[in-house]
Amino acid sequence: EQGIQMDRAKLLSEISRYASGKCDQRVVKTWINESAEMIGFVREIMTEKYGVNMIYTYGDEAKWPAENAEHNTDYMYPEIEYTYDRSSGAARNELLLQYIQELGYDVDFKTSLAKLEKNSDGRITGIIAQSTEDDHFIRYNANQGVLLACGGFPGNPYMMEQLDPLGTSVTTACSYSPADKGYGIRAAVWAGANLDKEAAPMLFDRGIVAPGVDAGYVDSDSAFGGKAFPGKIRQFNPGTQPFLKVNRNGERFANESCPYNDIVYAAAHQPGRVYAQISDANFIEDAKRFHTIGCSAQTRNLGEDYFAQQVENGEKEGCFFKADTLEELADKMGFTGAAKDTFLATVERYNELYDKQNDEDFGKPAYRLSAIRTAPFYGCWLGASLLTTEQGIAINEKGQALDTNNQPMEGLYITGDMSGSFFANNYPCLM
């Protein structure tokens, strides 16, 4: 509708590169070739049937700035992002449930998947579920097959620590659904399905925490598995801006103009696996120039009022700090002794690089450098915020689950976060 043409071959290559080749390109092609049809199907339900507007981002707002390729890797992203206007009607899932019910079907939400059932030929014939109300078991027969869409395993610390020790070690906050405990993945594996061997967490650099807090799990009596991440704020969106980042020694350690998860992985090599973001009074002005894309764009698009609310939330939790001088900010952030001296010297050096409009130290594009000279000065400590996991059950291009010999499992289909064969190492995210 907007006249935008996507280079499908380049997009396939980009997704494969992001996964270091650890994907099935035929599965990726299914997404590339059929995602538009799927969006059209959902839009027909949401807009034409229920009058809810589908909205999308395109053009400059969703386009990767060409200047990044002068120094950084030349990333490529699909130019149109679809979502729906929440203000124009009922919640999306409520409308989809209504659509299902109008077709004569029903959904039972008060169940938990216990196991898959299969016949003597190995075909999946149904499931055993357990009631979340009184724990009784229910058998569902499925003559045409079973489609599992049970989400990932971010809410299961046992699986996180075993399957993704690196991602777990750099995470400070969570924005996932606690219900995503990996039960669907476990049931499929018990039935003989093949689980991807590479972790693929969806990490955002927005896990704001108080000074002195390390990344990784802490004990929690109220959390599933007795463990939780320490952050009190699910996602601190202003954290996804390419401002100066330093470790606990006050040292800069990476190019901050990078995809969401790159800086948190770089912090895996730093004390406590956390880092501090430093900026000044020109935060929003700088953010508009940085022009990050994706969901991080809401900080620049919503402006000063939104930023002020985010700051207030951070201050209430003892995680965000304002100061009239850099020395005062260093004290509030917990820098002492040699670390404080190094911090102040790092800021001075960063200002020099800004004046030169040339990042001689780490190669950040000039338009994403910023001066740190105008009070008030801002600072906070950050790690990763875990949204979900994408390490899932291996599938073919038809969505069929594969067994450990990579052969289709008759009667079993996988979709959503629990499907695999697509991602590895990380989730392709924006900058």
Q: Model-predicted segments: where are they?
A:
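A glycine-rich dinucleotide-binding beta-alpha-beta segment and adjacent secondary-structure elements
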Residues: K115, T336-N426
